[in-house]
Amino acid sequence: MNRTGRALAMGCLLLLQPLLAQAGGNSLLIPAMGRCTLNTQPENLEEALAACVQAAKGGDAEAEYELGEFYYDVNNPKRDLNQALSYFEQASLQGHAMAQFKLGTMFYKGEGVPANNIQAYIVLKMAAVNGAEDALDTADEVAEQM
């Protein structure tokens, strides 16, 4: 390993040190910081939902996105497009590409809000710039209808 490689490896280890301390020194238990998981068993759903809401209140864009997905899901008995829209907007403001893609799609289809092709196009272009792969195609589709 050359000098640059050693310096990079040392830098990575120094960055991981606080996470290793939280895991009690067990490198296999490094916590996923600020994440929430809603794909749990039904009996654990309320607890998982509460954890996600707490993370979202703390500004975790991924938690906001996950909550948006949860409330957007057509198979969810708790489906709420207004809640989904709100969480997607919060994550979108932090540059979360998939939240921007979902938000743009909701504006385009008029889900939870009146359809607005101009707003959809702008948000979808932002999503494409931030890395959402399908956003550019959807933005082109919106542009054809403007």
What feature does the model see in each segment?
Residues I30-N39, E66-D73, K102-K109, D140-Q145:
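Hydrophobic face of amphipathic alpha-helices that form TPR/SEL1-like repeat modules
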